[in-house]
Curated annotation (Swiss-Prot):
The active site is at residue 314. It comes from Leuconostoc mesenteroides subsp. mesenteroides (strain ATCC 8293 / DSM 20343 / BCRC 11652 / CCM 1803 / JCM 6124 / NCDO 523 / NBRC 100496 / NCIMB 8023 / NCTC 12954 / NRRL B-1118 / 37Y). This is 3-phosphoshikimate 1-carboxyvinyltransferase. GO terms for molecular function: 3-phosphoshikimate 1-carboxyvinyltransferase activity. Catalyzes the transfer of the enolpyruvyl moiety of phosphoenolpyruvate (PEP) to the 5-hydroxyl of shikimate-3-phosphate (S3P) to produce enolpyruvyl shikimate-3-phosphate and inorganic phosphate. GO terms for cellular component: cytoplasm. The lineage of its organism: Bacteria, Bacillati, Bacillota, Bacilli, Lactobacillales. Phosphoenolpyruvate binds at residues 22, 94, 122, 169, 345, 391. GO terms for biological process: amino acid biosynthetic process; aromatic amino acid family biosynthetic process; chorismate biosynthetic process. It is found in: Cytoplasm.
Length: 434
């Protein structure tokens, strides 16, 4: 339980470097493990979720060393993992679970996988179904959930799969199985989802074709270890972008942020709301990077629809907070995906922000946020809850910066899933400037 206070009248100022991208850190570990030779990962995110991915590969016999911001992986190739002595703990990580269901679907031994109570409520059928079409075999609790068994298997077959809903996790699971499968595996996307897996497969020497939403891979004979520079996580940077925009008299620069065009939906949506966001590109061999500067300014309500969701699904909680401060209404629709995140984020976003006086209507697939609300506590103090969800916890911290009265946050430990040290970093730009 921690006490949070409003920002000073002169606002938030300074430069901040947020931790490495969670999605890319997961994938760098995975590709490093299945490659041959050494992979060095810089600006590696040491968060709870990513450490569970690391723990899985160590249990499978992969040698991994790390310092505070670098990991070194000695790859074993795709066929040299050892059978673990116990079940594989996914913690709270949906990324680990879904991607590894594909990556580990062709091992000569059963793999028992389990997670915490939150992860055990998240559906797995939508990733298990296409993988089963490839001859992968799973035993899921109640045919849907963890704990589960990835069954021993010696053969995968390529498929053509039309994605029913844009999902980078499902797509990546199929691709990671596809590089081990006989024949071609083709995925058809109507809406683009984040493409970190495709980019990283190329970086590690894999063959992949992408053409206007059609992605094709074949069985890969060998991948080679690489040096991977992980950009700062745009999903984490989004909290500081919104903080700078909605806290009066602020100006913040967020350094070396990954601005992959399949992930920068939050920037596009904030710009549609009227934000002027300055990007200063940084030369990079891998993912595109930029320094991002924001200043306090007036925002306007917009409509966020299904086609916007894949590029900004993780940022919708903090966008909802921004919308409470915008002029006019913001309508979020086509966002059913939020209901199967770490929490039902439609419900938890509304639960927490309305405690501070926000005016929000819940819809089955989103919400309507009536803007222009001065956030305030009840009787001088309000208790907010992270609900065990890192992004809800971080949204609450940013909300406190513009809230009259004292805010007390419970469940703050959830933020370490993606951003250990988040509260300290917020404090560093919040201190009173002379």
């Amino acid at each position: 339980m921690i006490k949070l206070t409003k920002a000073e009248k002169n606002g938030l100022h300074g430069e901040i470097t947020v931790p490495g991208d969670k999605s890319i850190s997961h994938r760098a570990l995975m590709f490093g493990a299945i490659a041959e030779g050494k992979t060095v990962i810089d600006n590696f995110l040491m968060s709870d979720d990513v450490m569970h991915t690391m723990g899985v590969f160590r249990a499978l016999g992969v040698e991994i060393d790390h310092t505070e911001s670098q990991a070194t992986v000695i790859g074993k190739g795709l066929t040299n993992f050892k059978a673990p002595s116990a079940g594989l703990d996914m913690g709270n990580s949906g990324t680990s679970t879904r991607l590894l269901m594909g990556l580990l679907s062709k091992q000569p031994f059963d793999l028992n996988i389990f997670g915490d109570s939150s992860l055990s409520k998240r559906p797995l059928r939508r990733v298990a179904d296409p993988l089963s079409m490839m001859n992968a075999q799973f035993e899921l609790s109640n045919d849907e959930f963890l704990p589960a068994v990835i069954k021993a298997n010696t053969e995968l077959n390529g498929i053509t799969y039309h994605m029913p809903v844009a999902s980078a996790q499902v797509k990546s699971a199929i691709l990671l199985a596809g590089i081990q499968a006989e024949g071609e595996t083709t995925i058809i996307e109507d809406l683009p989802s984040r493409d970190h897996t495709e980019r990283m497969l190329r970086q590690f020497g894999g063959q992949i074709k992408t053409d206007n939403g059609v992605i094709t891979v074949k069985k890969q004979s060998k991948l080679s270890g690489q040096h991977v520079l992980v950009p700062s996580d745009i999903s984490s940077a989004a909290f500081f972008m919104v903080a700078g925009l909605i806290t009066p008299n602020s100006e913040i620069t967020i350094k070396k942020v990954g601005v992959n065009p399949t992930r920068d939906g939050v920037i596009k949506l904030l710009e549609r709301m009227g934000a002027e966001i300055t990007q200063k590109p940084i030369a990079s061999d891998g993912e595109p990077l930029a320094d991002i500067t924001v200043k306090a300014q007036t925002l306007h309500g917009i409509a966020i629809t299904a086609e916007d969701i894949p590029g900004a699904v993780d940022e919708l909680p903090i966008l909802a907070l921004a919308a409470t401060q915008a002029v006019g209404d913001t309508i979020i629709s086509g966002a059913e995906e939020l209901r199967v995140k770490e929490t039902d984020r439609i419900s938890t976003v509304i639960s927490e922000l309305t405690k501070l006086g926000a005016d929000i209507d819940e819809k089955p697939d989103g919400m309507v946020i009536h803007g222009g609300t001065l956030l305030h506590t009840s009787n001088g103090s309000t208790l907010l809850d992270s609900h065990g969800d890192h992004r809800i916890g971080m949204m609450n911290v940013i909300a406190s910066l513009i809230t009259e009265g004292d805010v007390v946050l419970t469940g703050e430990e959830a933020m370490s899933v993606s951003y250990p040290g988040f509260v300290e970093d917020v404090s560093s730009i919040k201190r009173e400037w002379l």
